[in-house]
Swiss-Prot record:
Changing K544A: Lack of acetylation. Maintains protein's instability in exponential phase. Becomes unstable in stationary phase. Residues 731-813 are annotated as: Disordered. This is Ribonuclease R. The gene is rnr. Its EC number is 3.1.13.1. Residues 737-749, 761-774 have a biased composition (Basic and acidic residues). GO terms for molecular function: 3'-5' RNA helicase activity; 3'-5'-RNA exonuclease activity; exoribonuclease II activity; RNA binding; RNA exonuclease activity, producing 5'-phosphomonoesters; RNA nuclease activity.
Amino acid sequence: MSQDPFQEREAEKYANPIPSREFILEHLTKREKPASRDELAVELHIEGEEQLEGLRRRLRAMERDGQLVFTRRQCYALPERLDLVKGTVIGHRDGYGFLRVEGRKDDLYLSSEQMKTCIHGDQVLAQPLGADRKGRREARIVRVLVPKTSQIVGRYFTEAGVGFVVPDDSRLSFDILIPPDQIMGARMGFVVVVELTQRPTRRTKAVGKIVEVLGDNMGTGMAVDIALRTHEIPYIWPQAVEQQVAGLKEEVPEEAKAGRVDLRDLPLVTIDGEDARDFDDAVYCEKKRGGGWRLWVAIADVSYYVRPSTPLDREARNRGTSVYFPSQVIPMLPEVLSNGLCSLNPQVDRLCMVCEMTVSSKGRLTGYKFYEAVMSSHARLTYTKVWHILQGDQDLREQYAPLVKHLEELHNLYKVLDKAREERGGISFESEEAKFIFNAERRIERIEQTQRNDAHKLIEECMILANISAARFVEKAKEPALFRIHDKPSTEAITSFRSVLAELGLELPGGNKPEPRDYAELLESVADRPDAEMLQTMLLRSMKQAIYDPENRGHFGLALQSYAHFTSPIRRYPDLTLHRAIKYLLAKEQGHQGNTTETGGYHYSMEEMLQLGQHCSMAERRADEATRDVADWLKCDFMLDQVGNVFKGVISSVTGFGFFVRLDDLFIDGLVHVSSLDNDYYRFDQVGQRLMGESSGQTYRLGDRVEVRVEAVNMDERKIDFSLISSERAPRNVGKTAREKAKKGDAGKKGGKRRQVGKKVNFEPDSAFRGEKKTKPKAAKKDARKAKKPSAKTQKIAAATKAKRAAKKKVAE
């Protein structure tokens, strides 16, 4: 144990420490063959019953997590020595599946026979095999490490007197038998929640019991209910949390204000959307006499009310983030905090954490300091109001006269910060997002495009600056904290993206490792193209997903060496942990001893941060998937009434079985199946992202403008089928390049910008982001998958829904 480099860490956690996981893995790596538990106990100098029991538990935990394999000879071995991998099962509605292994580019194929030993969502240990006759690399399931134990949502049916549930998630390709005494009063076609009592095997069917009946009226509310349960999102407040918040008052206690910097006279304001209910950030800036600005970013002091290890903290950590569905919000914190005590509502005292910064006239962050304060927001402003004020709206300028000059100064600061972002090469995404407008029945009445103006971007730049300051502060002090990490795109993703661009007459410079600046200039060069939104989406897909991690590797998209989330502790748990770390450091500077402070500061260990990073990243992905499910259902529900109508759109994706079309202004995608095209054999060119008719020569390519008719809506699969009316070839290389635009300058150009690339930049990009020489992209292998027709169940449900609506409409008339 004395050679264990993690001995001190283990001694901090356990009174009678045992070798760390890392040391056990290192020991087995040096060993030529697997070892039994008794052999490991001798070789690792384990003594006494307590240590032996600790070793037994640790080995079992390492086996559960896939770090070790327990062989038939009762020995522990390294999975890589046995050519085994750990991964997550991804099911398919046709019975087969895939194994997603972290760190591998391609998923491994699981045959329908292998899928009988596991279900979608299981974490398994598997053995990679050779390729099948279709060239797919297969895998054999060795053991289920962590079975999917969550509840399953589906519809209840009866057939020949036997009750069963068909899962709503098509990746669960099995029915669940329900014994007669476990039905809970569900009737034919009802949406129910099932708990498995017997998992499906090669010889037996799945058996379960109904634990909740959601009803048969499938609407927006039920779509949210299904998503919450399918993705295991916590939505019920535990009784202990209810009890903890029951004693909270609406006003900030006077004793809480003591010892804080008083900023109540500083004209801080909140700027949010019209429908926002929780306000966690306020801003103010003023011009410095010598040039540049002083910027105050005040953030709600959630950490004062949510203390570590309390029921409230445990539930906030469990949720990880607030989940914003189109029609409702599942908050991370109870409403008394999120919309009350922690929300920076106007004209009331609130506790806050402040990041006060100095910014040079060139937009360079020259200084920052953090402190705890008390504030009173001088106004609750909206993006629309601020934009109109900046545009000269006289009525609003009179209404908010005392604040106008401060808002104009914020706008001046924004313009400098925006230019500084361009100089360092940060990528600016101008995404078009859909906003659903609901009617009285909570169905989509229409879909509108959200408009981003300088007020949105102004707040965004202020928040980025505060996040950078927070990241630098904890990093300089070497304090364990969660950084917001955006890794560089993989070489394969870059090659694939560059191939698509080449087909469209575009180019991404930078070789195999393009810099953020290369992506930013590409986006600027295509800004005026009709397919700009599609290209931006493809660019995003070519990049890696941002995560939380205590190991700082920089933020590629923003071209920053250090970045963390500090500005939204009401709705993001990583921000709350960062506030605690900053408070701990501030108290430590004043000579405070111990891991906790009087106002909610806390010192986390690196081990805690590693676990939190994984959990918070998972919670973010979980929320994204759930909201996407509901949005897809709402879009399908909206399109049910559009069957037979004709729309214009653009080809957004091409596959071997057809192409997807994104409808103009609606942001809704549907499939034109290859079988519905002209009578011809179509070949899929994956590199060129196009379908080509062998006889006619007709080509359908990414970016082509098309006119389509809505043929069918598959509510079960959340998919929409189109048929092609006409198509128009997308022009190649439309729009000036960034270099050509720069020659003409900015004068008289609507929305145009000249990218200034100088030697001195605002924030020096990580050296890992620097480019290399260009390499020719490799051609990808062809793919030819077939689409499936809607299931009989789907057609039944869709027909019943349509008939029900028609009947309601008739009664109303």
